[in-house]
UniProtKB/Swiss-Prot annotation:
Quaternary state and interactors: Homodimer.
Organism encoding this protein: Mus musculus (Mouse)
Catalytic activity: sulfite + O2 + H2O = sulfate + H2O2
EC number: 1.8.3.1
Name of the protein in question: Sulfite oxidase, mitochondrial
Length: 546
């Protein structure tokens, strides 16, 4: 029994403790028949008259050793695991790079000073939470609440809040998305909060016009619930002109203009770039694009009433939405004044979409529609319009929606040197059949869309079913559009013959516009860290059965 007790105490110990621990050395001396301190097995048999006394002595020593070692192990673990405690005031005082940037999440405290400049959303976004809790901002930007983000944050943990300070967050983390509208269940959701979703490819090209309920949705912030009766659009007047405060009824008094326009997110098909190398952004597939018939007042008419005229200097029309984050920062963007004042550019302050008032997800009651330009400039829930000497200072204009070389990473990127995306390049994609589908031999119907920015018309779509060895020209469907005003996509279709012995098809599409711009054949040469402008040949692989 004594031998078992000895082993149960000693064998479980780390080697360093077995040799160096003072309690252990004393035990070995007490149990051993020699004076050596080497950890050899002691004799636990007794033949003299004092054997009972010696037995109890050894047992007591071993039990005492167990208590001492358990306490020693507890002290070691406690010294390693006991976090340092901080008060909310400690955290609050670390709210800038000079004092250090601390934040809290639950009861944990983090020093993120070294991460501020590395934050993918820009230092200014992270600094909003400096000296306080992350919860209100994670509730708003739910993409942060992911295991890999928490793992990254854990590297910066320095301690915990005092128990009395961690009972409740200093700011109520209420749900800013509680009043978001109900969405169509067919939409493929890329982000729930803020809501971002795309229609499934099989529905996307069912018709030339995308139905409102399945029009792709790109939100950056919670959807505001605006009263059309109290809504006002503020238009800053030109020097010598008059600023305007326009109700929805006032906008209806301007000449109504209608135009069919395709909107495409800069991140459409980003998921294909992610397969080459990790990028920052939502994993859009081929559905971050849709087409609608928009109606409203021409922006040039409204600006003219406020006294603005086209001038020689480089000026920009800045838009500000009524959606905002907890600090009151609204979504914003801008376009060149030359485009805004050109009647042929057909820029709208739209209040109708496919003959109906704008849905809430798409900007009710008023949004900007800029034909031929990236969706990021089509500001929704429009609240303010101004003409400035520089483009918008919004984060989404200055620090986002820009393209870079494949060699640029987050350590070398300089957003100030890259121009903001306005017109998008030629684009096409296959919507039918889908990747991995099974088709029958004989004849297969291949369908998709094609579009180019800046009003450039799609003049041809080439399709291959053998991985690019041979090509066939697809039939283009949709409205005929004026030269340089081809604001909407073309739906295309090809019926291809499939030999009975064919086991698979490697289908590719590529489009050409009226400037003879063509799509690049692969993704790697156009990869960029934001995953925007993804317009390589689109490819799907399908299986063929007899």
């Amino acid at each position: 029994m004594l031998l078992q007790l000895y082993r149960s105490v000693v064998v479980r110990l780390p080697q360093a403790i077995r040799v160096k621990s003072t309690p252990l050395r004393l035990c070995i001396q007490a149990c051993s028949t020699n004076d050596s301190l080497e950890p050899q097995h002691p004799s636990l048999t007794f033949s003299d008259d004092n054997s009972r006394t010696r037995r109890w002595k050894v047992m007591g020593t071993l039990l005492g050793l167990g208590v001492v070692l358990v306490y020693h192990e507890h002290r070691c673990r406690a010294s390693q695991e006991s976090p340092r405690m901080y008060s909310k005031e400690d955290v609050r005082s670390h709210n800038n790079p000079k004092t250090g940037v601390w934040v809290t999440l639950g009861s944990e405290v983090f020093d993120v000073t070294k991460f501020v400049d590395l934050h993918p959303g820009g230092p200014s976004k992270l600094m909003l939470a400096a000296g306080g809790p992350l919860e209100p901002f994670w509730a708003l930007y739910a993409v942060h609440n992911q295991p890999h983000v928490r793992e990254l944050l854990a590297e910066y943990k320095i301690g915990e809040l005092n128990p009395e300070d961690s009972m409740s967050p200093s700011v109520e983390a209420s749900d800013p998305y509680a009043d978001d509208p109900i969405r169509h269940p067919a939409l493929r959701i890329n982000s729930q909060r803020p809501f971002n979703a795309e229609p499934p490819p099989e529905l996307l090209t069912e018709g030339y016009i995308t139905p409102n309920p399945i029009f792709f949705t790109r939100n950056h912030l919670p959807v505001p619930n605006l009263d059309p009766h109290t809504y006002r659009l503020h238009v800053v007047g030109a020097p010598g002109g008059q600023s305007l405060s326009l109700s929805l009824d006032d906008l209806h008094k301007f000449p109504k203009h209608e135009v069919t326009v395709t909107l495409q997110c800069a991140g459409n098909r980003r998921s294909e770039m992610s397969k080459v190398k990790e990028v920052k952004g939502l994993e859009w597939r081929t559905g971050a694009i849709s087409t609608a018939r928009w109606a409203g007042a021409r922006l040039c008419d409204v600006l003219a009433q406020a006294g603005h005229r086209l001038c020689d200097s480089e000026a920009h029309v800045c838009f500000e939405g009524l959606d905002s984050d907890p600090t009151g920062t609204a979504y914003g963007a801008s376009i060149p004044l030359a485009r805004a004042m050109d009647p042929e550019a057909e820029v709208l302050l739209a209040y109708e979409m496919n003959g109906q008032p704008l849905p809430r997800d798409h900007g009710f009651p008023v949004r900007v529609v800029v034909p031929g330009v990236v969706g990021a400039r089509h500001v929704k829930w429009l609240g303010r319009v101004s003409v400035e000497s520089e483009e918008s200072y919004s984060h989404w204009q200055r620090r986002d929606y820009k393209g870079f070389s494949p060699s640029v990473d987050w350590d070398t990127v300089n957003f100030d040197l890259a121009p903001s995306i306005q017109e998008l390049p030629i684009q096409s994609a296959i919507t039918q059949p889908q990747d991995g589908a099974i088709v029958e031999s004989g004849e297969v119907t291949i369908k998709g869309y094609a579009w180019s920015g800046g009003g450039r018309a799609v003049i041809r779509v080439d399709v291959s079913v053998d991985g690019g060895l041979t090509w066939q020209e697809a039939e283009l469907e949709g409205e005929e559009q004026c030269p340089r005003k081809a604001w909407a996509w073309r739906i295309w279709q090809l019926k291809a013959q499939v030999p009975a012995e064919q086991k698979e098809l490697n289908i590719i599409c590529k489009a050409v516009d009226d400037s003879y711009n063509v799509q690049p054949d692969t993704v790697a040469p156009i990869w960029n860290l934001r995953g925007v402008l993804s317009n390589a040949w689109h490819r799907v692989h399908v299986q063929v059965v007899p």
